[in-house]
Curated annotation (Swiss-Prot):
<comment type="similarity">
    <text>Belongs to the PMP-22/EMP/MP20 family. CACNG subfamily.</text>
</comment>
<keyword id="KW-1003">Cell membrane</keyword>
<dbReference type="GO" id="GO:0015075">
    <property type="term" value="F:monoatomic ion transmembrane transporter activity"/>
</dbReference>
<keyword id="KW-0628">Postsynaptic cell membrane</keyword>
<feature type="transmembrane region" description="Helical">
    <location>
        <begin position="129"/>
        <end position="149"/>
    </location>
</feature>
<feature type="transmembrane region" description="Helical">
    <location>
        <begin position="103"/>
        <end position="123"/>
    </location>
</feature>
<comment type="function">
    <text>Regulates the gating properties of AMPA-selective glutamate receptors (AMPARs). Modulates their gating properties by accelerating their rates of activation, deactivation and desensitization. Displays subunit-specific AMPA receptor regulation. Shows specificity for GRIA1, GRIA4 and the long isoform of GRIA2. Thought to stabilize the calcium channel in an inactivated (closed) state.</text>
</comment>
<dbReference type="GO" id="GO:0005245">
    <property type="term" value="F:voltage-gated calcium channel activity"/>
</dbReference>
<dbReference type="GO" id="GO:2000311">
    <property type="term" value="P:regulation of AMPA receptor activity"/>
</dbReference>
<keyword id="KW-0812">Transmembrane</keyword>
<keyword id="KW-0770">Synapse</keyword>
<dbReference type="GO" id="GO:0098978">
    <property type="term" value="C:glutamatergic synapse"/>
</dbReference>
<keyword id="KW-0472">Membrane</keyword>
<dbReference type="GO" id="GO:0098839">
    <property type="term" value="C:postsynaptic density membrane"/>
</dbReference>
<dbReference type="GO" id="GO:0051968">
    <property type="term" value="P:positive regulation of synaptic transmission, glutamatergic"/>
</dbReference>
<dbReference type="GO" id="GO:0098970">
    <property type="term" value="P:postsynaptic neurotransmitter receptor diffusion trapping"/>
</dbReference>
<comment type="subunit">
    <text>The L-type calcium channel is composed of five subunits: alpha-1, alpha-2/delta, beta and gamma. Acts as an auxiliary subunit for AMPA-selective glutamate receptors (AMPARs). Found in a complex with GRIA1, GRIA2, GRIA3, GRIA4, CNIH2, CNIH3, CACNG2, CACNG3, CACNG4, CACNG7 and CACNG8. Interacts with GRIA1, GRIA2, GRIA3 and GRIA4.</text>
</comment>
Length: 275
């Protein structure tokens, strides 16, 4: 991958992370996940008379029609809900969606951590591991969010299946824009996570490709003597001695092996090397 493509992918992952975090924050804090309508069907003209209409989020229920029109109530997660405000079907729906509430919160927490690590990785590009860690957090955030969305949908569908149908009653529901924001956030978060992990793999592969072999740092002068490359290998010397001792030992070795070095066939043609 070229440097231009890598920069574009990095920028795109950052934009997806910011948009996903913003959309999920809006979705969690707003009250437009679900719209519910209840009423009766007039037998004469088969028209529908709306008795109650509301929209709900993860924390509140706001009424659009009925006796409590214009009022909002906090969803009680510990104490049982007041069944006098709505019908039994609506209360059961609001009770069952409680099981899905913790997952968007966990997803928002993971997404925030991934966003912070992603920004730190862009500020300090040599920390390539941060791109991988942020990608993992983004993927975990998306998985937690999709589990919450599936539980939210299944809770409503289960109540609709168990509800006794009556020809004279009207019950309708639809998902709101807060739910749509959460679903879009899932797609953006997963995309940002996959791109972050992909960038880490590309950077890691590039570092290994351009890293020289360790043998390149230890060339030998020639093959005619076992001691010809020793002076280029500091790790071959015995450690714990002073530089003067090392220099003296090297001089003694050169003097003791000088007759053997004269046997090198190229010695007469070389003036700067003993071989």
């Amino acid at each position: 991958m070229s440097a231009c493509g890598r920069k574009a992918l990095t920028l795109l992952s950052s934009v997806f992370a910011v948009c996903g975090l913003g959309l999920l924050g809006i979705a969690v804090s707003t009250d437009y996940w679900l719209y519910l309508e209840e009423g009766v069907i007039v037998p004469q003209n088969q028209s529908t008379e709306i008795k109650m209409s509301l929209h709900s989020g993860l924390w509140r229920v706001c009424f659009l029609a009925g006796e409590e029109r214009g009022r909002c109530f906090t969803i009680e997660y510990v104490m049982p809900m007041n069944t006098q405000l709505t019908s039994e079907s609506t209360v059961n729906v609001l009770k069952m969606i409680r099981s899905a509430t913790p997952f968007p919160l966990v997803s928002l927490f993971f997404m925030f951590i991934g966003f912070i690590l992603n920004n730190i990785g862009h500020i300090r590009p040599h920390r390539t591991i941060l791109a991988f860690v942020s990608g993992i957090f983004f993927i975990l955030s998306g998985l937690s969010l999709v589990v919450g969305l599936v539980l939210y949908i299944s809770s409503i569908n289960d109540e609709m299946l168990n509800r006794t149908k009556d020809a004279e009653t009207y019950f309708n529901y639809k998902y709101g824009w807060s739910f749509a924001f959460a679903a879009i956030s899932f797609l953006l978060t997963e995309s940002a996570g996959v791109m972050s992990v992909y960038l880490f793999m590309k950077r890691y592969t590039a570092e290994d490709m351009y890293r020289p072999h360790p043998g390149f740092y230890r060339p030998r002068l020639s093959n005619c003597s076992d001691y010809s490359g020793q002076f280029l290998h500091p790790d071959a010397w015995v450690r714990g001695r002073s530089p003067s001792d090392i220099s003296s030992e090297a001089s003694l070795q050169m003097n003791s092996n000088y007759p053997a070095l004269l046997k090198c066939p190229d010695y007469d043609q070389m003036s700067s090397s003993p071989c």
